[in-house]
A protein has these predicted regions:
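Polar/acidic, low-complexity leader/linker segments enriched in S/T/G and N/D
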Residues: 1-12
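Helix-rich interaction surfaces within compact, conserved domain-sized segments
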Residues: 6, 83-133
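Short, solvent-exposed beta-alpha or beta-beta edge segments that form flexible loop/patches at the rim
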Residues: 17-51
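Short glycine-rich, low-complexity/disordered patches
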Residues: 21-28, 78-92
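Short, charged/polar surface micro-motifs in flexible loops or helix N-caps
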Residues: 32-33, 57-59
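Oligomerization/assembly interface segments of phage tail-like spikes and tubes
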Residues: 46-56, 108-110
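A broadly used, surface-exposed interaction patch
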Residues: 59-88
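Short, cationic low-complexity segments
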Residues: 77-80, 126-142
Length: 142
């Protein structure tokens, strides 16, 4: 699943604690579903909860959440755009170990589309990127 690979790389590169302690980051897929229809090709969509576990986190929790939020904006923008999804699709829990350290769990409800394209009687399977965020393309006229 490409989004989990992307998310791990983004967290590793943007969160100082994870740059120094990549072994403390775990990613799990939970409640996975395959959504498909009776279309002519076997295209489908993954729906799953990504569970991000960070053990013994001693960094700034606000930085961690801001980095995840930035990744979501680029890779699953419907969570920020939809009021219902904002309430349900980005959750966290923490076990406070002491005044400076916690185990943190972040849950993200994600989707990934996979297209099956029939070329000369054979299917070519490819993951599709998220649609462009319309607010990133916003232009004003004067």
């Amino acid at each position: 699943m490409k989004k989990l690979t992307s998310l791990r790389g983004y967290l590793d590169s943007k969160v100082p604690f994870l740059k120094d302690n990549p072994e403390n980051l775990y990613l799990f897929v939970e409640n996975g579903r395959i959504i498909s229809t009776l279309e002519e090709t076997p295209s489908f969509e993954y729906e799953y909860t990504a569970n991000i576990i960070i053990e013994h986190y001693s960094g700034d929790q606000n930085v961690l959440i801001a980095v995840v939020n930035d990744w979501l904006r680029k890779n699953q923008s419907d969570i920020s755009a939809n009021p219902t999804k904002r309430q349900q699709d980005f959750k966290f829990e923490a076990v406070i170990l002491d005044n400076t350290t916690a185990h943190i769990s972040i849950e993200l409800n994600l989707t990934e589309r996979v297209l099956a394209i029939n070329k000369d009687g054979k299917y070519v399977i490819e993951a599709t990127p998220e649609p462009v965020n319309p607010f990133d393309e916003w232009q004003t006229t004067q």
